[in-house]
A protein has these predicted regions:
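Short glycine-aspartate micro-motif
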Residues: 3-7, 127-131, 192
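Conserved ATP-binding subdomain of kinase catalytic cores across diverse folds
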Residues: 24-39, 56-59, 66
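Ser/Thr-glycine-rich phosphate-binding loops at phosphate-binding pockets of nucleotides
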Residues: 10-12, 133-139, 197
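N-terminal basic/disordered segments at the start of proteins
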Residues: 1-27
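Helical "lid/coupling" subdomains associated with nucleotide-phosphate turnover
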Residues: 17, 40-63, 80-91, 95-119, ...
Length: 288
C-alpha cells in the first residue's frame, strides 16, 4: 500500500509518497519546495504572503497525490506554527486549501526524528542524535534504543542565516541547551547521529570533497571543509555548489556552523548520517 506524507518545515515543504515493503519505507516519489516559511514570521505573526505561498504548494501536492491515486495521506507542520499568534488562522487556511495539517510540538518532532532515524542507525543503541532544521534544532539522547530525552530549541539554519556566521553564537546556544537539559549528556558517545537536511547536505559535500561513499563523517575532516567555506575558498565553494541543491546553499553555512558547535559540545569525533528523519517517524506513527 502507498502513503503520502507532506512535511511543512521552516525551510522546505516536502511531499514523499512511500510504499511499505516488509515494514521498510521505499520512496516512490519525492519533491520539495524551498518556501523558507520561517522567514515570513514578523512580531510573532505569520505574514499572509507566507501562508499563501505554502497554500499554493499544498494545492500542487494535492494534484500529485490525486495523479498517483493516493488515498492515504497526511500532512504535518513543525517549528513555524509554534511561536506565532495567528497559528489557528494559518492552520485553517491550509485546511481551506484542501489539506488538514497536524501541528507537531517540539518534543513530538524530536521523538519522531529519532524513530525515523532507526531505519538505518539502530546499530548505535546508546548515544545522542540531532536534527538542524530551518527554524529549530532537535536533540535526542537514547539508551538501549529507548529515548531518554527529546527536546527542540527554536534555532535553525534559516534563522541563523539572518545573523553573522559565528561559532561564539552557536556554541552558546548549545552550551545553554546542555545546561538546561543535562540528560542529553548522560548518553554521550564518540559517534553522534545526524538527522535531516543540514546533516545530509553535509554528507553530500563531504563525499564530494573526499571521494567517499561512506555514510559517516570524521569531525576533523568536516572541520576542514567548514573552515574553507568560512574563508570563502573558491574551490570549496565550487564543491558546495556541486553537492548541495541551490535552494539550500544560502542557509547551508549557518547550519554547518551550528553542526560544528553541536559536535564540539558533545565531544563527538564521528557523525553517522541517517537517511530517515521526522517524515519516516511520522509515517510509522500515524499510518499504523
Amino acid at each position: 500500500m502507498q502513503f503520502g506524507v507532506i512535511d511543512i518545515g521552516s525551510n522546505t515543504v516536502v511531499l514523499i509518497i512511500y510504499e511499505l515493503e516488509n515494514g521498510f519505507p521505499k520512496v516512490i516519489f519525492h519533491t520539495s519546495s524551498h518556501v523558507h516559511l520561517v522567514s515570513y514570521i514578523e512580531n510573532h505573526v505569520m505574514k499572509e504572503e507566507g501562508i499563501e505561498k505554502t497554500c499554493n504548494v499544498l494545492k500542487e501536492y494535492k494534484k500529485i497525490l490525486e495523479e498517483y491515486q493516493i488515498k492515504e495521506y497526511k500532512a504535518f507542520i513543525t517549528e513555524p506554527h509554534r511561536n506565532i499568534d495567528n497559528r489557528k488562522e494559518m492552520l485553517q487556511a491550509f485546511s481551506n486549501c484542501g489539506i488538514e495539517v497536524i501541528a507537531l510540538s517540539g518534543k513530538e518532532e524530536a521523538e519522531l526524528d529519532y524513530l525515523g532515524s532507526q531505519i538505518d542507525t539502530k546499530f548505535i543503541s546508546t548515544g545522542t542524535a540531532f536534527d538542524i532544521g530551518g527554524g529549530s534544532t532537535e536533540f535526542i539522547s537514547f539508551e538501549n534504543n529507548k529515548i531518554i530525552e527529546a527536546i527542540s530549541i527554536p534555532v535553525g539554519c534559516v534563522r541563523l542565516s539572518k545573523q553573522e556566521v559565528s561559532p561564539l553564537i552557536t556554541d552558546q546556544y548549545v552550551e545553554d541547551t546542555l545546561d538546561t537539559y543535562p540528560k542529553l549528556l548522560e548518553t554521550k558517545t564518540n559517534t553522534i547521529i545526524g538527522i535531516g537536511g543540514t546533516a545530509r547536505a553535509s554528507l553530500k559535500l563531504y563525499q564530494n570533497v573526499y571521494h567517499t561513499h561512506e555514510s559517516y563523517m570524521d569531525v576533523s575532516k568536516l572541520e576542514y571543509i567548514y573552515n574553507k567555506l568560512v574563508e570563502k575558498d573558491t574551490d570549496m565553494i565550487s564543491h558546495m555548489k556541486e553537492s548541495i541543491e541551490a535552494g539550500r546553499q544560502e542557509v547551508y553555512l549557518p547550519g554547518l556552523n551550528m553542526l560544528m558547535s553541536i559536535v564540539k559540545g558533545f565531544k563527538a569525533n564521528k557523525i553517522q548520517i541517517s537517511t530517515g528523519c521526522v517524515r519516516e517517524g511520522f509515517l510509522f506513527t500515524y499510518f499504523n
